Amino acid sequence: MGNRQIGFQTMSDVACRPPWWRRSLLPFLSGVLSVILLLVIAYFGVRKFGTGGRLPERQPKTEAELAAGFSAGAQDEAAANRADIAWQVETLYARQQLDPNATLDFLLLSGGGDHAAFGAGFLSGWASVEGKNAMPKFDGVSGVSAGALIAPFAFLGTPEALEAINRLVRDPKPDWVVPRGLFFFLPENASFADVPGLMRDLCAEVDLNFAERIVRASTGGKRVLLIQATDADLGTGRTFDAVAAARQAVATGDPDILRNILLASAAVPGAFPPREIEGRLYMDGSITSNFYYGDPTDEGQSFGAVWRREHPDAPIPKTRYWLVINEYIRPAPVTLQPKWLAIVERSIYMSVRSSEMIALRHLYAIAEATKLRGGGEVEVRWVAVPQTWKTTKVGYFDKEKMRELSDEGRRLGADPQAWMTKAP
């Protein structure tokens, strides 16, 4: 009878054909391999030709060269510290002749990422206070990480300058932080994101005129503006003299000298590109300390000791530290899910908050020890984002969140009772 036909196929043809899944497997695997091949080609193509996210290759230094650099840096910092204390003593002694209640005042601005909007708002609110609780003219201002971006404006201290930085943080742009694209994860990249918008807006504010104002506000070097960044090569913090940088910017006509210091201090590792300054690679200052309150000093070189030697008959004036913490002082409680990324993020956040609290307690211990040694009275006052403050906004540099933080900061800044006076 012959084979029975189905269409144009015989029963034997159908019996000999492989199953449908086998027929589909080869095209599927071919497609997958093609995609992988294209990705590999793109990967190596980007590595070879796409250099936009990379810094130039750096010439390695020997251990001896790095050790010498570390030693020289430590000596320079110690010399600068002694010079600062010397002018503090003489400046305050002259001021004391006119005002027996004269004080030495330092403003410390911590890191905190986009939460720095709190600090900017706080200073703007504090500027509105009059009378005995009014903002003093600070003898020194220090800034770390996001606090470094606020510090120059706080150093100027005028209502216009304080409102300028508050206005800036209240209006973050979508391009302040942008990913580097599909291959953001390439290990050759300096970071997985870039900050073109933040650089643009910061450069618009920190120009040559701004640098000139910083130099004038230093009153001939009698006031200091210190920015801390982390020296990734030497594994230590470095404190930049931003007044000296501003002076150099004016002399050369290049404000990038000052801008790079500010951006180096705020360069979040991996996220934002580091900065190379004077042959060293710098990144976020909060890696070494989230706020800067001075370097270790031998007892014989302390402010109180120098004062007693130079002016033994004059009472040692009071030193006051005003610390603005651009974050919660303690991690906000959460129910953490047991997922590795959430665990890593929470761990890093907790470690920064813990080290910040330890540093604040250390500052209180220094204040107490200074008083016990007869080095004068030291007051420490601090403020942080209230633990009760909450937001539903998520994302980095979210405009609504930053405006809420600025508003909360302004409210507290206008309230003299907002300052904490005891260690956490």
Model-inferred region functions:
Residues V144-S145:
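Catalytic nucleophile serine of serine hydrolases
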